[in-house]
Structures are given as structure tokens and as C-alpha cells.
Amino acid sequence: MPNIKSAIKRVEITKARTIRNASIKSAVKTAIRRYEEALAKADKEVAETALRNAMVAVDKAVTKGVLHKNAAARKKSRLTKRFNKIAG
């Protein structure tokens, strides 16, 4: 346990950020899971909406500093690729 006042504050900040980051990551995973479920049903319209929602979630994670922009680009590229397979 830290003894210095600034170190104590940093621990508190880290805990708060960890909680926030976990929440944002969870939102991204949930959006991607919903998209994958829509793909499994092969419903193009629902999948398109879910894809948009997943992309928004990924972009928000980048804005908040939770995901690196290249990791986000890779995720979005893979999601789009899978959509294009069923859209054919």
C-alpha cells in the first residue's frame, strides 16, 4: 500500500480507470457478439444495423483511449469482411 499522498491518489485513479475501461470493453464485446448472432441468422438487415452499432462502439473505445486506433481498424475490417461475405 502506498504511503505517499500522490501515490495514494494514483491508485484511486487507476481503480476508477480500470472500472471505466472494463465497462467500455464490455460494451464493445457485447456489440460484436450481437453482430455475430445476426450473422449466424443470416439476416442481412439486422446484421447491417448490428455492424453499425459495433463500429460505433469500437470508435468510442478509441476515443476514450481504451483501444488503439490500429486495433480498432483491424476489428472493423474483420467485421466488415464477414458482412460482405453474406451480403455477397
Curated annotation (Swiss-Prot):
Q: What are this entry's molecular-function GO terms?
A: small ribosomal subunit rRNA binding; structural constituent of ribosome
**Swiss-Prot/TrEMBL GO biological process terms:** translation
| Keywords recorded for this protein, A-Z | Ribonucleoprotein, Ribosomal protein, RNA-binding, rRNA-binding
Q: Which residues form a coiled coil?
A: none
Q: Which GO terms describe its cellular component?
A: cytosol; small ribosomal subunit
* Role summary: Binds directly to 16S ribosomal RNA.
Protein family per UniProt: Belongs to the bacterial ribosomal protein bS20 family.
Concerning PANTHER family, the annotation shows: 30S RIBOSOMAL PROTEIN S20, SMALL RIBOSOMAL SUBUNIT PROTEIN BS20C
- Tell me what this protein is called: Small ribosomal subunit protein bS20
Q: Which Gene3D superfamilies match?
A: Ribosomal protein S20
Q: Which domain of life is it from?
A: Bacteria
Pfam families listed in its UniProt record:
Ribosomal_S20p
